[in-house]
Amino acid sequence: PAGPSKPADAPAIKWTVPAGKHAPYVYFIRNGNRMKIGTTTDLRRRIRTLALRAENIALLFEGDQRREHEFHKQFAEHRIGNTEWFACEGTLADFVRDQTVRVFREEESK
């Protein structure tokens, strides 16, 4: 099957991180085998707060807390305790891979 050229556990998309305040984004940011699904209107600050780098961003979606909560429900089986962190395995890992492939295909068709 088609897929990104990098391993599933490596960030594959180089996202542009806006400076300062912006419309809300739901982000999937990786730290080892864990994925944080959160929302922010200042992505650059959030990355610094988490002591991570832009390269750790796996996916970005336009959306607010409602969309974030939809993702939390969708991947509830992978949730780590009562946090916004999820084990990046099973359906969550598949989703990240599939969305990465979708983004690459959209970029190629431009």
What residues fall within each predicted segment?
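Non-catalytic accessory segments flanking enzymatic or RNA/DNA-binding domains
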Residues: 1-110
